[in-house]
Amino acid sequence: MHYLRYFAIAFLLLLSSCSVTRHKPLIEGSTTTIPNTPSSNFINGSIFQQDNSLYYGYQPLFEDRRPKNIGDILTVLLQENVSASKSSSSNASRKSNANLEMNALPKIINKIIGNDQLSTDINSNNGFNGKGGSSAANTFSGTITVTVIDILTNGNLKVIGEKKISINQGTESIRFYGIVNPKTIDHNNQVMSNLISDSKIEYIGDGYINEVQKMNWLQRLFLNYFPF
């Protein structure tokens, strides 16, 4: 009897552990980087020095201050508005009639049915009508500052960043990843998110408000395995 009680407790603990839904992050890895320390090259007295020299990270006097090195930052203006809709309908119908009539019957059959003729009518009617539709709309706006983590061979910048906001007992986290063309960065060191290639935007939160929005393990059990 005691073993059955211990087994029931262990079974409930196992189910409670299965109730925790593991969230797989869309953007993995570190969301920041530290630029490499430039090597000390020989200074030849020229105005223009080689890359990765002691003047690494300098900003030209007569040019816009745009990110061009690993570790530089820029601001991304999040303006995402995606909407989609789909509708479909189909119908089919089929109708058939069959008539069988026999005027001359054998005597044996005539004695059974008591009639000199046999007639049969068969009617069939089949119809189908189906309609379906779906729609989705997503809007995301805000700002996030990202860091350049790599420079591609064509000059495009690979950026990544994260912003965390803690309010009372909950924490909201925004992560962003994408590839930026430096030509799309304006004079305020900002770029629109719809101009960034291969962008990934992740907005997640934790806390009791986020927990109440999740389905518990018993509800998921009925949802996945209940046949009705």
Curated annotation (Swiss-Prot):
It comes from the Bacteria. Disulfide bonds: none annotated. It is found in: Cell membrane; Bacterial flagellum basal body. The gene is flgH. GO terms for cellular component: bacterial-type flagellum basal body, distal rod, L ring; cell outer membrane; plasma membrane. Residues 1-17 form the signal peptide. A lipid is attached at residue 18 (N-palmitoyl cysteine). One of its GO terms (biological process) is bacterial-type flagellum-dependent cell motility. A lipid is attached at residue 18 (S-diacylglycerol cysteine). HAMAP family: FlgH. It comes from Wigglesworthia glossinidia brevipalpis. The keyword Disulfide bond does not apply. Assembles around the rod to form the L-ring and probably protects the motor/basal body from shearing forces during rotation. The basal body constitutes a major portion of the flagellar organelle and consists of four rings (L,P,S, and M) mounted on a central rod. Keywords: Bacterial flagellum, Cell membrane, Lipoprotein, Membrane, Palmitate, Signal. Pfam families: FlgH (PF02107). This is Flagellar L-ring protein. Belongs to the FlgH family.
